[in-house]
Regions:
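N-terminal small-domain helix-loop-helix segment of the aminotransferase-like
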Residues: 43-142, 149, 328-329
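Helix C-cap/helix->beta junction micro-motif
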Residues: 178, 240-241, 407
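PLP-dependent aminotransferase class I/II
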Residues: 275-354, 359-364
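Conserved PLP-binding catalytic core of the aspartate aminotransferase-like
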Residues: 341-342, 355-406
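PLP-dependent aminotransferase-like
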Residues: 47, 152-215, 225
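Active-site phosphate-binding strand-loop segment of PLP-dependent enzymes
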Residues: 189-259
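N-terminal secretory signal peptides and thylakoid transit peptides that target proteins
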Residues: 1-18
Length: 415
């Protein structure tokens, strides 16, 4: 990759590439900027919002950018694609709401989050047709604190938690804090690169020492938007074996063209829904991760109170303001963004297929993540042996370093 390549040249602004395996070839994207711009123009047809202008986040204490410069140096590191946040400016309504609040110049204790809860309920109703009762919503400082509280409430120490793997690596931290153990139901990949549940294995793992199923919907990193039939089958099996479903749906606002997000709480079987807690946020949707705000809810009051007992949220005034502004006024911005992200996925799939055939990518159904399959290329540079020599965790971690040094792009190792 050329050193002078702008970081928006390839997949402008869209989240993280996760490298499953590793690349033995440098992806030469020089000269692709116009092609991507044309692709977006043809796919979207213009609009009110500018998602093309380069927005420099360096110097903002960003994990995605500044941490990588500290780690690798600015000569090697040029493009950050290893953290799941976007590089677009947030919609103006958020900045305007924050500016208005800062004029009060006092940061005393918060009184109520009811207005935010109302906005959350309206968002779910308007976008997904879900009737979420306001009294069932609990505001959290992130999805992780909510999940940890739920695991503490329902899972004794050393008990097992089912997860469909590959999955979001942050879940292992939640298990650590709740002193629980991963029970991995490995997804099956078909010849077309699409992942499916191994149902026999899933049910076999619903053992008496398993108390929770940590569902990711849409799934990180594969991008699966689980169908209603899949969700019902998962829920039915969990209910049968006394396992509670914890549905992390943080990526639900990103669904690609022709796909459908089905909220677990919208399933037609009340008993299945009552056996679940849903966790959501718009931190991905509007790049608000630093504002530390999320929520969870359940239709089961007994289960909800058990989780609330273990949950504590020290909320941030500006986080409340920013999130409420996003829920109430951010929809037009998001509606304009979604086809842009969809076009990014299309471009990535087409470009990699034609220019980098050893890197396999199947367009995700949802999320703004790209799950790249590169394991065939690990052998090309003997990454396994070199990782061992360097004392690195895996060949993928060696390849993360290798890609930064040669392609100047930082990806999530995916292992």
């Amino acid at each position: 990759m050329e050193h002078e390549l702008g970081r928006r040249t390839f997949l402008k602004g869209a989240g993280a590439f996760a490298a499953a395996g590793a690349s033995a070839g440098v992806i030469n994207l020089a000269g692709q900027q116009n092609a991507l711009a044309d692709h977006h123009a043809s796919a979207i047809g213009g609009g009110t919002y500018d998602f093309d202008s380069v927005y420099d986040r360096v110097g903002t204490n960003s994990v995605k950018w500044d941490r990588q410069i500290t780690k690798y140096g600015s000569d090697d590191f040029k493009i950050g694609m290893g953290i799941a946040d976007m590089d677009f400016k947030a919609p103006a309504c958020i900045g305007e709401a924050l500016e208005a609040r800062t004029k009060h110049e006092n940061w005393g204790y918060l009184d109520s989050t009811e207005s935010l809860k109302e906005a959350i309920c309206n968002w779910n109703k308007e976008r997904y047709g879900i009737d979420v009762a306001q009294e069932t919503v609990t505001i959290a400082s992130g999805v992780h604190p909510g999940l940890i509280a739920a695991l503490l409430a329902i899972s004794p120490p050393a008990s097992k938690v089912i997860m469909n793997t590959p999955t979001y690596n942050g879940f292992w931290t939640d298990l650590k804090w709740s002193r629980t153990v991963a029970n991995e139901n490995k997804l099956i990949k078909d010849k077309n690169g699409v992942y499916h549940i191994d149902w026999d294995d899933f049910e076999a793992r619903l053992t008496p020492d398993t108390h929770a199923f940590l569902l990711c919907n849409p799934q990180n990193p594969t991008g699966n938007c689980w169908s209603e039939d899949d969700l019902l089958r998962m829920g039915e099996l969990c209910l049968k074996h006394g396992v509670t479903v914890l549905a992390d749906e943080i990526h639900c606002d990103f669904v690609n063209k022709g796909q459908t997000y089905t909220p677990f709480a919208s399933l037609p079987d009340k008993a299945i829904v009552d056996n679940s807690v849903t966790f959501k946020a718009v931190s991905k949707t509007f790049s608000l991760a630093g504002m530390k705000n999320a929520y969870f809810y359940s239709t089961n009051p007994v289960l909800l109170e058990r989780v609330r007992y273990y949950h504590r949220a020290d909320l941030n005034t500006l986080g409340i303001v920013a999130n409420e502004a996003a829920y109430r006024e951010g929809a037009p911005w998001l509606d304009a963004l979604l086809p842009y992200i969809d076009a990014n996925h299309d471009f990535a799939e087409q470009y990699l297929k034609s220019q980098c055939p050893d890197i396999r990518y199947k367009k995700a159904q949802g999320t703004y993540l790209a799950w790249l399959k590169m394991e065939d290329l690990v052998t090309g540079i003997d990454a396994k042996a070199k990782a061992e020599q360097a004392g690195l965790k895996s060949p993928e971690h060696y390849m993360e370093q290798w890609l930064v040094e040669r392609a100047h792009v930082q990806l999530n190792p995916g292992s």
